[in-house]
C-alpha cells in the first residue's frame, strides 16, 4: 500500500482526491492530502523506511503552502466540492503526527502549523446549543449541539467526525499552555457521546451500537426528515471508528514516541 502511495504522490507533495485502481486520476484536487500523511508517518515508524517519512514531509510542504498559509481548507470529503471541516481537522492532525516524530526547530515548525490549522478547524464547532421546536426529536431527547462540528458549506449538518482531533487539542494545550484548548476537547468528548444508543437511551436508533451519521440541526437537509431528525443517509462504519479514536485517547502519541 505504501509503495502505491509513493507512486500516487505529485511533485508538489499533494495526493489526488480521486483515482482509479490503475492510478489514472479522476480528481487532482489536493484537499485530501493530509489523509495520506497519517499512514505515511505510521508506516515510517513501523517499517523504518525513511522514504515514507520523506513523503510525509512533502505533504506538509504542500499543506503549508496551499492550505494552512491560505486558510483554504477544501474538498477533503468525496461528496463536497467546497470548504469543509475535515480538511482543516486532518491538516492539524497530519502536522501533529509530524511534530511527534521530529525534534528542535522542525518540531516547533510542525507544532505551529498544527496550532494554526486547529484554530481554523475549531471555527466549525458549535459553542452554543441550537434551539429545537417542541416535537422535533433531537429537542425532545435533550440534544445539545455545543461541541459538535458543522460538516461543510455544502452539507449543512453536524456529525461526529472528530477522530484524533481532541488529542490534538490536548497536546496543543500542553505545548502552548493554552488551557482553553483542552477545555474544549472535554466539551467535544462529553457532547459527542449523547447519541450513543444503549438500553433505556436509544435516541431514536433501532439497534444498540449504531450511531447516526447525518444529524440535522437546521432547516437545510438532503430532502429527508428535516430539522431535529436524522437523515436516512447512514454510514455506520466511520462514525464508530471516529468515536473509537475519541474515547481511546493518546494512541498515536504512545505509538510514535515508543
Model region roles, listed by residue range:
Residues 1-258:
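Glycan-recognition and catalytic cores of secretory/periplasmic carbohydrate-active enzymes
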Amino acid at each position: 500500500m505504501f509503495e502505491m502511495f509513493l507512486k500516487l504522490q505529485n511533485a508538489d507533495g499533494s495526493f489526488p482526491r480521486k483515482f482509479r485502481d490503475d492510478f489514472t486520476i479522476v480528481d487532482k484536487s489536493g484537499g485530501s492530502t493530509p489523509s495520506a500523511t497519517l499512514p505515511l508517518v505510521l508506516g515510517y515508524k513501523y517499517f523504518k523506511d525513511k522514504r515514507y517519512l520523506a513523503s510525509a514531509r512533502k505533504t506538509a510542504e504542500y499543506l503549508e503552502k496551499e492550505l494552512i498559509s491560505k486558510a483554504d481548507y477544501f474538498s477533503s470529503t468525496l461528496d463536497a466540492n467546497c470548504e469543509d471541516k475535515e480538511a482543516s481537522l486532518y491538516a492539524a492532525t497530519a502536522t501533529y503526527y509530524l511534530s511527534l516524530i521530529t525534534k528542535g526547530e522542525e518540531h516547533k515548525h510542525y507544532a505551529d502549523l498544527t496550532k494554526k490549522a486547529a484554530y481554523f478547524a475549531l471555527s466549525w464547532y458549535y459553542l452554543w446549543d441550537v434551539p429545537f421546536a417542541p416535537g422535533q426529536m433531537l429537542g425532545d431527547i435533550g440534544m445539545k449541539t455545543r461541541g459538535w462540528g458543522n460538516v461543510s458549506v455544502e452539507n449543512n449538518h453536524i456529525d461526529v467526525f472528530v477522530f484524533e482531533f481532541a488529542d490534538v487539542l490536548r497536546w496543543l494545550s500542553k505545548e502552548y499552555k493554552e488551557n482553553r484548548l483542552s477545555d474544549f476537547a472535554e466539551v467535544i468528548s462529553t457532547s459527542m457521546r449523547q447519541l450513543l444508543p444503549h438500553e433505556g437511551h436509544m435516541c431514536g436508533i433501532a439497534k444498540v451500537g449504531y450511531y447516526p451519521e447525518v444529524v440535522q440541526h437546521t432547516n437545510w437537509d438532503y430532502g429527508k426528515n428535516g430539522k431535529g431528525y436524522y437523515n436516512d443517509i447512514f454510514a455506520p462504519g466511520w462514525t464508530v471508528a471516529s468515536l473509537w479514536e475519541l474515547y481511546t485517547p493518546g494512541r498515536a502519541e504512545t505509538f510514535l514516541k515508543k
